């Protein structure tokens, strides 16, 4: 279970061994700590030190976010795993394992982009054949990028990172140019902005604000998975090391952007559940209204906890993310080959 504590005046404490959310002294909700897997503290909500201790004792992930979805920090149980895992992670940066992982992360992202475009095209085959044709054309362009990616080989990631990112960037441009065709004009979406930064504070329109908020929530889930698997979240392969940036978690996240975030955002827009007027412009930057932000967050968490068939099992997306973090560990330790997460629907 995930617990969201959102808004000024909300307070999370403990009472008779239970986690309790209060507002103006009145208990709004009580939860057993052992039933929780994550707590999200948003904006100016507060938490007591006793609650923090109880949550950490029960290995509950605690994430602090601002109102824009920016991750301010995390509290988690002391790291698990073995020193061998991290040694292999650092060594892989200088050999072919790092190249293989980077390529698999990008391959999965491109394959999932093509799956999204295929589904969107099928839905418009009769109602808007011209747009459907454009979507399928973009899919073919991404497929060509996949073929180009297959030809990239090197002894270490530093020798091919720029080339890999160039191919990934080209594929993403085809993807977002196509996605813009299915988003109503009133949303004023002209493609991704601030991709490199990936921060909600750089969004100029409501679609980018929604995407960036969603990717922040997904990143928090990936950081948790990477740490639970015993990996160093800051030592990535595809994304370079930057102080304070969880590069490996961002690498892992490439597997899940489309299936966890993009689908949710496109659905909310398609049903007009979040509208252009839910964008509040401040200093030329779009900030989601409180109602839109809460609806988006609830939809994202529901998606993370929803189940799908994967490897013959009915698994939540959050469980699949953890499974893939552990797959990375198994690959680094020479136990089996790593393959990215791809879902055809």
Swiss-Prot record:
Tell me the Gene Ontology biological-process terms attached to this UniProt entry. Answer: defense response to virus; maintenance of CRISPR repeat elements
Tell me its cofactors: a divalent metal cation
Residues recorded as binding a divalent metal cation, renumbered to this chain, are 168, 239, 254
- GO MF annotations in UniProt: DNA binding; endonuclease activity; metal ion binding; RNA binding
Signal sequence extent:
none
**Record-linked Pfam families:** Cas_Cas1
Q: What is its EC number?
A: 3.1.-.-
Q: Keywords in UniProt for this one?
A: Antiviral defense, DNA-binding, Endonuclease, Hydrolase, Magnesium, Manganese, Metal-binding, Nuclease, RNA-binding
Q: Which family does it belong to?
A: Belongs to the CRISPR-associated endonuclease Cas1 family.
Instruction: State what this protein does.
Output: CRISPR (clustered regularly interspaced short palindromic repeat), is an adaptive immune system that provides protection against mobile genetic elements (viruses, transposable elements and conjugative plasmids). CRISPR clusters contain sequences complementary to antecedent mobile elements and target invading nucleic acids. CRISPR clusters are transcribed and processed into CRISPR RNA (crRNA). Involved in the integration of spacer DNA into the CRISPR cassette. Acts as a dsDNA and ssRNA nuclease, binds to linear and circular dsDNA and linear ssRNA and ssDNA.
Assembly and oligomerization: Forms a heterotetramer with a Cas2 homodimer. Homodimer.
Its name, as the record gives it, is CRISPR-associated endonuclease Cas1 1
**What species is given as this protein's source?**
Archaeoglobus fulgidus (strain ATCC 49558 / DSM 4304 / JCM 9628 / NBRC 100126 / VC-16)
Top-level taxonomy: Archaea, Methanobacteriati, Methanobacteriota, Archaeoglobi, Archaeoglobales
Which gene produces this protein? cas1-1
């Amino acid at each position: 279970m995930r617990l969201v504590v959102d808004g000024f005046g909300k307070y999370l404490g403990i009472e008779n061994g239970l986690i309790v959310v209060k507002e103006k002294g009145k208990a709004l909700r009580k939860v057993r700590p052992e039933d929780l897997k994550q707590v999200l503290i948003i904006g100016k909500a507060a938490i007591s030190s006793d609650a923090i201790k109880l949550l950490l004792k029960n290995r509950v992930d605690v994430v602090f976010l601002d109102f824009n979805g920016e991750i301010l920090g995390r509290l988690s149980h002391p790291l698990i795993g073995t020193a061998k895992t991290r040694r292999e992670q650092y060594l892989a940066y200088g050999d072919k394992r790092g190249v293989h992982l980077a390529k698999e992360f990008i391959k999965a992202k491109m394959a999932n982009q093509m799956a999204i475009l295929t589904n969107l095209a099928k839905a418009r085959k009769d109602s808007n054949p011209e747009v459907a044709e454009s979507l399928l054309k973009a899919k073919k362009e991404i497929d060509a990028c996949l073929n180009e990616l297959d030809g990239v080989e090197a002894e270490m990631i530093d020798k091919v990172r720029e080339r890999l990112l160039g191919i990934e960037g080209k594929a993403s441009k085809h993807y977002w140019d196509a996605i813009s065709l299915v988003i109503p004009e009133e949303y004023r979406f002209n493609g991704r902005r601030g991709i490199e930064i990936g921060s909600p504070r750089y969004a100029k329109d409501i679609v980018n604000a929604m995407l960036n908020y969603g990717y922040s929530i997904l990143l928090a889930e990936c950081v948790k998975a990477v740490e639970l698997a015993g990996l160093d979240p800051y030592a990535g392969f595809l994304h370079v090391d930057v102080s304070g940036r969880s590069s490996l978690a961002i690498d892992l996240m490439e597997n899940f952007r489309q299936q966890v975030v993009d689908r949710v955002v496109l659905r909310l827009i398609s049903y007009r559940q979040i509208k252009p007027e839910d964008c509040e412009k401040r200093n030329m930057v779009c900030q989601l209204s409180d109602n839109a932000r809460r609806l988006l967050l609830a939809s994202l968490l529901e998606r993370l906890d929803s189940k799908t068939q994967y490897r013959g099992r009915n698994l939540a997306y959050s469980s699949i993310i953890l499974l893939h973090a552990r797959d990375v560990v198994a690959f680094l330790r020479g136990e089996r080959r790593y393959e990215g997460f791809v879902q055809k629907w």
